[in-house]
Amino acid sequence: MLKKQSAGLVLWGAILFVAWNALLLLFFWTRPVPSRLPSDNALDDDPASLTREVIRLAQDAEVELERQRGLLQQIREHHALWSQRWKVPTAAPPAQPHVPVTPPPAVIPILVIACDRSTVRRCLDKLLHYRPSAELFPIIVSQDCGHEETAQVIASYGSAVTHIRQPDLSNIAVQPDHRKFQGYYKIARHYRWALGQIFHNFNYPAAVVVEDDLEVAPDFFEYFQATYPLLKADPSLWCVSAWNDNGKEQMVDSSKPELLYRTDFFPGLGWLLLAELWAELEPKWPKAFWDDWMRRPEQRKGRACVRPEISRTMTFGRKGVSHGQFFDQHLKFIKLNQQFVPFTQLDLSYLQQEAYDRDFLARVYGAPQLQVEKVRTNDRKELGEVRVQYTGRDSFKAFAKALGVMDDLKSGVPRAGYRGIVTFLFRGRRVHLAPPQTWDGYDPSWT
């Protein structure tokens, strides 16, 4: 509105200026001629008089022109003052909000390690049932052993899965006292070949490794999709596992399926690794017992894995190289999560090392200390969270057995432990089996 008023003022000034010049021109044309000299032909006969008259007219015109210049200057000055007084600041165009570019989700293949169990169908059925996207989660079944019935089961899925076969089915030369471990040698050879295919042939950036006797939870894919960026960003992590070694039903909080932890123990049994880690491990991959080899300090290098409160995998395979002993004693009791958790919508930054160490250690060592006997007899029920302190290998094993958690150690690291601390539920109470606060590292001689 103000801009229109200012423009109108300029227009009127210009009109007045033009009108004034028109009147001036009319004035000169209609101005009466001054009285002549006595002789009517005096001016015509006297050139000097004519010159004086022309000069006088020119001077009059110059004076009038100067007055017009002054008038025009006043118009300009008044316009400038008016514009300054009523000037409306020109608002800068609103800045476009910065919308972060969300990278497309990574393609994370599921590598199923198969051999001679036709029950791989149960594993594949669950994977395909819960898989949200065939493009984001291609399923690659790598088969060893040359078992034809298992091969037919895998082939029956057609293009829903990719079937690859480990070509070297020969026996492996081993020491005489290791002949009974031939199966462990073949497993290590198969893992090396299959992971090589994933990262060198298919060129994937990461992979989730699943054995053929595992059943997955409804949010299995959601869990790994959400934790993949965390694994990529945090160099203090080297894997994400779907497994809680102490995940028996009575030892987990079923009301908190979203709860995740860091652990120094390599759990396996459905785990995510990056191509960069495989590039590090492949040149020194062991000939046998690959999982225990992963748990050695030379491979772990102080790094941790992410693990859930409630397992996202469950093993149903009693048949295997361990002859079912570990399955009967422990594995079959692990609870499989059934409640879908939208992990990709949750803030998982609490799992980054600095924040996690600060908060987790404050919680553990801020909990009241209670003797193991009082925990077992459920004394001090009002204490919903307690700490049981051990001081050495023997006391750890004794307390772990008394409380029902796994008591074995691999290179000094307890199963599901973080900084020596094992967290679980006992009779509905949160218990931290922990070393003294002065703990300064694992002792690899503890086994």
Swiss-Prot record:
First-listed, main subcellular location of the protein, grouped into a coarse class: Golgi
Cytoplasmic side: 1-6
GO molecular function: alpha-1,3-mannosylglycoprotein 2-beta-N-acetylglucosaminyltransferase activity; manganese ion binding; protein N-acetylglucosaminyltransferase activity
Record topological domains on the Lumenal side: 30-447
SUPFAM superfamilies: Nucleotide-diphospho-sugar transferases (SSF53448)
Transmembrane spans: 7-29
Disulfides per UniProt: C115-C145, C239-C305
GO-annotated cellular components: Golgi medial cisterna; Golgi membrane; perinuclear region of cytoplasm
Subcellular localization, as worded in the UniProt entry: Golgi apparatus membrane; Cytoplasm, Perinuclear region
Note describing how the cofactor binds: The cofactor is mostly bound to the substrate.
Pathway the protein acts in: Protein modification; protein glycosylation
Keyword annotations: Cytoplasm, Disulfide bond, Glycosyltransferase, Golgi apparatus, Manganese, Membrane, Metal-binding, Signal-anchor, Transferase, Transmembrane, Transmembrane helix
Functional summary from the UniProt entry: Initiates complex N-linked carbohydrate formation. Essential for the conversion of high-mannose to hybrid and complex N-glycans.
Assembly with partners or alone: Interacts with MGAT4D. Interacts with BRI3.
PANTHER family listed in its UniProt record: ALPHA-1,3-MANNOSYL-GLYCOPROTEIN 2-BETA-N-ACETYLGLUCOSAMINYLTRANSFERASE, PROTEIN O-LINKED-MANNOSE BETA-1,2-N-ACETYLGLUCOSAMINYLTRANSFERASE 1/ALPHA-1,3-MANNOSYL-GLYCOPROTEIN 2-BETA-N-ACETYLGLUCOSAMINYLTRANSFERASE
Protein name: Alpha-1,3-mannosyl-glycoprotein 2-beta-N-acetylglucosaminyltransferase
Originating organism: Oryctolagus cuniculus
Encoding gene per record: MGAT1
